[in-house]
Regions:
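A short helix-coil junction within the Rossmann-fold of NAD(P)-dependent oxidoreductases
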Residues: 32-41
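Active-site-adjacent segment of SDR/Rossmann-fold oxidoreductases
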Residues: 55, 76-87
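C-terminal beta-strand-loop-alpha-helix "lid" module of Rossmann-like NAD(P)-dependent dehydrogenases
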Residues: 82-131
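Substrate-binding pocket helix/loop in short-chain dehydrogenase/reductase
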Residues: 6-7, 11-16
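Residue(s) in the substrate-gating loop at a strand-loop-helix junction
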Residues: 50
Length: 190
């Protein structure tokens, strides 16, 4: 689920919906399957994060926060369940052409805000264009199937448009100021 709007203007209800779906949904699913995996002393958990969980996306801040939470949770969980031979993997999709764009909840308060409105609408237009021109979902499905089939899959798998994957990977070695500048340029934030 995605909520588009300025972080400052988001309602507590919007934030709770975002976190309950994207983060606590993952937590609850893991809690449901872990007892049987521990008993079997094996298993594989594949949590879906996002490239937006690697870097904050403007006007998608609580979406990014929910996916950052999935990242941290998955890192800690992988360590905790290692003694039980349970693998934890995180898939970080970039933009895919799915129904996500059409189902995004748009903050009317942000759209109409004198300070955020114009910047928000420009950024939202870029975000929607990238999503509509994103990869076919089969690419994501194929990446997840590879993880399922591998005995020792990588902890993280980034998948999506090559430029997004490259940019997300570059966060490890690019200075924060450069990343912030590039994101401001890309999302037309002055």
């Amino acid at each position: 689920i995605g909520i588009g709007g300025a972080l400052e203007l988001a309602t507590e209800e919007e934030v709770n919906i975002q976190m309950n779906t994207n983060f606590f949904g993952v937590v609850n699913m893991c809690k449901a399957v872990l007892p049987s995996m521990r008993k079997a002393r094996k298993g594989k958990i594949i949590n879906i994060s996002s490239i937006g969980g690697v870097m904050g996306i403007p006007y998608q801040g609580f979406y990014s926060a929910s996916k950052f939470a999935v990242e941290g949770y998955s890192e800690a969980l992988a360590l905790e369940v290692h003694p039980f031979h349970i693998k934890v993997c995180v898939v970080e999709p970039g933009d895919f052409n799915t129904g996500f764009t059409d189902n995004r909840n748009i903050s009317e308060q942000t759209r109409l805000d004198a300070d955020y409105g114009e910047s928000f609408l420009k950024s939202l237009g870029i975000i929607e264009k990238e999503e509509r021109n994103g990869c076919h979902p089969r690419k994501l499905g194929a990446a997840i199937c590879k993880i399922v089939e591998r005995t020792n899959p990588p902890f993280r798998t980034k998948v999506g448009p090559w430029i997004q994957v490259l940019f997300a990977k570059s966060k490890k070695w690019l200075p924060d100021a450069v990343m912030q500048y590039a994101l401001r340029i890309f999302y037309a934030i002055k």
